């Protein structure tokens, strides 16, 4: 598993129910573009605002709709046994892997985090990608990642939404001890850098609305066209300004999708709120800049 994996937004109707027609359109759009993986129940997908049964339903529908790409399901929770049930469910529906964020809300020691992931790995026989996002959840120390990778063969990699090259570099050292361990960035702006360091790809939110730039970076890198890859990486860094403008990942990405004319409503589940017209106009300027740039390069 490698390349460009998309942590999907969860489209909602005005009444906050899941819009499965929009989900179907979105997955078809992404697969037609050629992304390597589809990931439901993600941070960008507002998984914390979904009920337990909705998480299962969304996972099932995503599996049904994904036919070309790898299919990943987020199964994270603050409850270890709920994680086990969701992870077993992901296996039962035929997911290729699960992505499990470290427990959030309560601060945990490294020993507790190690035990949490170990219990899940022992009881759920499916490939597991750890998910480190210290801005939202307990951080996962690199030594804990190393121990988990060496002790559990079904823990196959990590998604690191961590703004630190040092952390990424230390994760890549785990690959030296376990060659098949995968390291993905969760931050669009680190995608090219991680590839140059020996990483395996990215699980990145901007790929919801601009997958072509991520795929062009991936292809240029694989073809050793590094000058082109660097140019594209700089464009991607500029696009990520939407995160600073908006109040949440989901708001930023959904407004960018609306700006591009996608059939996605600008609706977030409470307690999240969609940003207003001023923020939307700023995001639209960034999206239109990228579209104009692409036309000029054709």
Curated annotation (Swiss-Prot):
Give the signal peptide, or none: none
Give the residues annotated as active site: 43 (charge relay system), 105 (charge relay system), 131 (proton donor), 159 (schiff-base intermediate with substrate)
Source domain of life is Archaea
Q: Which GO terms describe its molecular function?
A: 2-dehydro-3-deoxy-phosphogluconate aldolase activity; 4-hydroxy-tetrahydrodipicolinate synthase activity
UniProt cross-references to CDD domains, sorted A to Z:
DHDPS-like
Q: Name one GO biological process term.
A: small molecule metabolic process
Return the EC number: 4.-.-.-
Arranged from A to Z, the UniProt key words for this protein are: Cytoplasm, Lyase, Schiff base
Q: Name one GO cellular component term.
A: cytoplasm
Q: What is its main location?
A: cytoplasm
Asked whether the keyword Ribonucleoprotein is assigned, the reply is no
Compartment(s): Cytoplasm
Instruction: Spell out the Pfam families in the cross-references.
Output: DHDPS
Q: How does it assemble?
A: Homotetramer.
Question: Which family does the entry's similarity section mention?
Answer: Belongs to the DapA family.
Spell out the protein name for this chain: Uncharacterized DapA-like lyase PF0657
Q: Which organism is it from?
A: Pyrococcus furiosus (strain ATCC 43587 / DSM 3638 / JCM 8422 / Vc1)
UniProt lineage? Archaea, Methanobacteriati, Methanobacteriota, Thermococci, Thermococcales
Gene from which this protein is expressed: dapAL
């Amino acid at each position: 598993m490698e390349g460009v994996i998309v942590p999907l937004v969860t489209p909602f109707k005005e009444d906050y129910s899941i819009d499965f027609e929009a989900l179907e359109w979105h997955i078809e759009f992404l697969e037609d573009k050629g992304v390597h993986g589809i990931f439901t129940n993600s941070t960008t997908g507002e998984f914390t605002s979904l009920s337990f049964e909705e998480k299962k339903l969304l996972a099932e529908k995503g599996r049904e709709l994904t036919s070309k790409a790898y299919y990943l399901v987020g199964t994270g929770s603050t409850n270890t046994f709920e994680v086990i049930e969701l992870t077993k469910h992901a296996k039962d529906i035929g997911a290729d892997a699960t992505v499990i964020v470290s427990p959030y809300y309560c601060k945990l020691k490294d020993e507790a985090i190690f035990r949490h992931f170990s219990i899940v790995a022992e009881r759920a026989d499916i490939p597991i990608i750890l998910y480190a996002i210290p801005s939202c959840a307990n951080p996962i120390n690199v030594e804990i990642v190393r121990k988990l990778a060496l002790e559990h063969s079904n823990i196959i990699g990590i998604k690191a939404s961590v703004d630190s090259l040092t952390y990424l570099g230390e994760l890549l050292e785990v690959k030296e001890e376990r060659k098949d361990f995968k390291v993905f960035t969760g931050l669009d702006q680190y995608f090219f850098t991680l590839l140059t360091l020996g990483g395996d790809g990215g699980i990145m939110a901007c790929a919801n609305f601009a997958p072509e730039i991520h795929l062009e970076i991936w292809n240029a890198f694989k073809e050793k066209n590094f000058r082109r890859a660097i140019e594209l990486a700089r464009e991607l860094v500029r696009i990520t300004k939407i995160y600073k403008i908006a109040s949440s990942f989901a708001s930023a990405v959904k407004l960018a999708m609306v700006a591009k004319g996608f059939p996605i409503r600008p609706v977030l589940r409470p307690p999240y709120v969609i940003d207003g017209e001023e923020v939307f106009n700023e995001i639209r300027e960034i999206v239109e800049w990228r579209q104009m740039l692409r036309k000029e390069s054709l």
